[in-house]
């Protein structure tokens, strides 16, 4: 039985006092033990009503939102607006519907059979880098390695160029600063501010956003100058038109391409960091993984057709997404007074649908904190509570890249662990934090050696 890192759950008042006194910016530290048992209830004490919603039918009500009562929260919009404007990730209503209709055709290029060569190229580059690390015996940051790898793949998919292109590498560097510094939820303000209070971003975050948008603009201008010279997602977004024949402006194009880069690499990097950490500390899992690869693939290269048959590898990734969902919280705001089940919801209330909590809920999962990939086997489907597993969201705003992310992860985990053993330094010191995505509090340092 293996229980990977998790925060200590405390009574609500103690959790609140620790956060307030220590200035802890990790929202996971604010979650009381009761959150993992309630169907719907308050997240400690705060000036604005803040509710954690766990009951699956209420989660569906909030995320499907047929009446438009629960748009994405002001906290999320304020945090991301300097980077991605009023783009598809944060917009709502008619604006979102127009953008989604325009962008959807471009996402056909994220279909895994089309994108698989980009994944293979990125994986080959990562193998070469890890081989250099193994030869030198040097230590490196697992977090940054996974971010670099997934950014390389999404750049190849969106812009037809990997991170060896200087502009793409500059975007990655600035995104790293942004991810480390952005304050989606500054907890003291969450506790004491009223709804719709604007939270100013830090100067280093705003500077990172300026750099990212500048570098994305340079990549975009290269595509605009080339005309029809590319067959990639960026070109399709450039060509997109709405029902009235209008395309995106240059600033809107930067908004949308920023979303694709952010969503296409940051979430995958989060999940892969945790998957690699878990496998690095559990040699029995790695042995099963390699045995499956030998059985399914043999000694040859891992192809697209193999990824669908690597069941254990896929279930390792699915279980990683359960315990470490990349998007820890899906915050919504109540635009009007309403009810969720028997609970009165005030206008301006912050509604926290939390995959982190839902995936560890005591009523919905057997041994919820245990890492158990076999819980996803067909013969154990009866243990699953419908609607209690939402790593890619739910409803019309479900992640359009879910299949892409899954095949990408299966390929990367299988190829890299087939060739290398990963050795994490001080694994007992690793702890999770809710930032832009679910990340370790401090960078996870590791070494690699050739697999036996």
Report each predicted region and the residues it spans.
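Conserved cytochrome P450 K-helix/beta-meander segment immediately N-terminal to the heme-binding cysteine loop
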Residues: 353-381
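Conserved cytochrome P450 K-helix E-x-x-R motif and the immediately C-terminal K′/meander segment
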Residues: 17-38, 214, 218, 300-341
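N-terminal membrane-proximal hinge/A-helix region immediately C-terminal to the signal-anchor transmembrane segment
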Residues: 1-98, 118-125, 208, 336, ...
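Cytochrome P450 proximal C-terminal region
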Residues: 35, 123, 127, 173-177, ...
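Cytochrome P450 catalytic-core helices
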Residues: 267-292, 403-418
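Cytochrome P450 heme-thiolate monooxygenase catalytic core
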Residues: 2-8, 72-77, 95, 111-270, ...
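Cytochrome P450 I-helix active-site segment
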Residues: 7-11, 116-120, 171-177, 228-235, ...
